[in-house]
Regions:
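Alpha-helical scaffolding segments of alpha/beta enzyme cores, especially the outer helices
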Residues: 1-8, 12, 143, 147, ...
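Catalytic PLP-binding core of fold-type I/II PLP enzymes
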Residues: 1-39
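Active-site PLP attachment segment
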Residues: 35-90
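Conserved PLP-binding catalytic core of the aspartate aminotransferase-like
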Residues: 140-193, 197, 212-214
Length: 249
């Protein structure tokens, strides 16, 4: 999707523009000022190299004072770190607790105690991600996904037309033979079989979703294509044998 164009149209129409960047943040160049989004959220367990159970969100400063948090907790309040709330500077409510929110997006943070294990893991993942040249990463991954596309077409797969990112590709059954044989259920069986061979992909919306990373090599890609070719060949041959048996019967 052309996020920059969408952002421009949202601005013209005074529409709040929210982007789920989980599939791209950390490996694809994405600038909130360029796309003019108001909210950019991402789970850290994919391209941000973090653990499951943590997410990050950017919120445009224009909403910091007017948006109220979903979670009402002490860490979003002024002077929450003080030993006693009576030492807080600001509005103390009738219950004896400060009611003023802290400045900035921190007022919108989720509740609960800070996780002393997961948050340092998130920080380390972000440190590594910051060192990655996103442009160079896309060029390298585009080489891999272009080869996956070319090899997939030789087997009978194709991709949706239009521009695409370099780090994800979806191979769809394209030939009439594969379209008739590779039902969604059978595609899941193929994915499970490939997993046993150390080849990992996912079935999403009628396509094999393949997402190489920076440690993926061209040899890995060739192994993927060979394994996929063998699996599809086995299905085609099995179907031919079954048809022959029916004809003989």
């Amino acid at each position: 999707m052309d996020l920059k164009r969408i952002g421009e149209e949202c601005k013209k129409r005074d529409i709040i523009f929210v982007v789920d960047g989980t599939q791209s943040v950390g490996i694809f160049p994405l600038n909130v000022k360029e796309i003019q989004c108001h909210v950019l959220a991402a789970s850290v367990h994919k391209w941000l190299l973090g653990p499951h159970g943590q997410s990050l969100v950017y919120i445009d400063p224009c909403f910091h004072k007017c948006w109220l948090p979903l979670d009402q907790h002490e860490r979003s309040r002024v002077a929450f770190q003080n030993e006693v709330y009576d030492a807080a500077e600001g509005n103390i409510g009738p219950s004896g607790y400060p009611e003023d929110f802290v400045a900035g997006a921190a007022r919108l943070d989720s509740g609960g105690k800070k996780n002393p294990i997961l948050l340092p893991m998130v920080c380390e993942g972000l440190r590594i991600v910051r060192e990655i040249n996103k442009g160079s990463a896309q060029e390298y991954l585009k080489l891999l996904t272009n080869r996956i596309l070319a090899g997939g077409e030789e087997i009978g797969f194709g991709v949706q037309p239009g521009p695409r990112v370099g780090h994800i590709i979806g191979l769809r059954p394209q030939s009439s033979e594969l379209r008739s044989l590779l039902t969604p259920e059978r595609m899941v069986e193929v994915a499970d079989s490939l997993k046993c061979k150390g080849v990992f992909l996912a079935v999403r919306c009628g396509a094999f979703r393949i997402a190489p990373y920076l440690d993926t090599t061209m040899e890995d890609v060739e192994r993927l294509l060979q394994a996929l070719k063998e699996e599809c060949g086995s299905i085609i041959n099995w179907e031919k044998i079954q048809n022959c048996k029916k004809n003989i019967a």
